[in-house]
Amino acid sequence: MSDPVIGLILLVVLFAMLAGGLWVAMALASVALVALIAFSNAPSGLVMATTFWGHSHSWSLAALPLFILMGEILLRSRLSKDMFSGLAPWLGGLPGRLLHVNVLGCAIFAAVSGSSAATAATIGRMSVPELEGRGYPQGLVIGTLAGSATLGLLIPPSIILIVYGVATEQSIARLFVAGILPGLMLVCLFAGYVAVRAWMDPSLIPARGERLPYLARLKASRSLIPVALLILGVIGSIYTGLASPTDAAALGVVLSVILAFSTGGFTWRLLGDALMSATRTSCMIAFILLGAAFLSVAMGFTGIPRNLAAWIGEMGLSPYALLAVLTVFFIVLGCFLDGISVVVLTTSIVLPMVQAVGIDPLWELNRHFIGRPMRREPHLTPRLRKLRRRRRPRRLHRRCRGKRSPASIIWRAF
């Protein structure tokens, strides 16, 4: 049986399991077992036990639960409200006015939380009722929030960058550095779109309110100091070489706890809720990574990635042709799976293919998250589903669900 046929069989089995509602981690491990038993002579039980044990104590992966915990703590603190208060006085004079708060707020919060879901829930809980109350169109408010929340995929310390680094055995610090410029480019593009849209149709944007004096705006900016300290402590310690990503994650947890308590409104009960939520999320991601690692090892025993990479090399495809095919593949896959699942599921197959045509893994990272804007759209559906579950108050929850379908929100973001 040829490798393409084997790969197609395994892909059909995987999608059948996912369509049947099986957990992603269980589906990945089950496909790996099928591949080992049916298409190789390797001892499946020994390979599975060795893989699970070998990948369960990764030092790089230790940063993952810490960054998740930091995001959960910030989600329950008032730092997002303070951030809105500090940004709003400076952005009122720009075309689009306070809609830029969604863009810059998501960018800043993504830089301290590392999670797109936490960014969407936190900034949305604060900005959506405020902007709608001031007369901004709901479509633009939710569209800018949905699009800007995906900045958490790229702006360090992104959780998915850590997963990508572990899956591809790349330096997480280098991945963080590689995500800075593309992330800033996206921030500028999102803000530019808001400005152009407001310039083309001024009736969409409410009239500017009372202009605050310069000293009053400076005074309001003091609320940005805690966020700036957190960014400086986490990102600055990594880029200056004072700490590894794991050490910086631990520092970020300590700083986020201190700042959450010092700004008020944060209690020990909320800290316990953050710990439990971070534990559940970390365990879920850990199981997915173990299943993906087992699948990668199983694919190695079958020889499919190696032979597929050689086949791609013999076809003489240009890098752009391969990227076009991968873009369509990721758009389809992103409609069914979240970002972490897509990364761990496709790495063992896609990485040898892109390396076979001479594409650097770090460049592939940027293409994966920014080089194809349409690639990001399928992620809006699961992300907005999380946003609607977690946003408060309930009145806003009902209003968004009743008036904006996921398809409408995706169209607005697009």
Predicted regions and their residues:
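Alpha-helical transmembrane segments of multi-pass membrane transport proteins
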Residues: 1-414
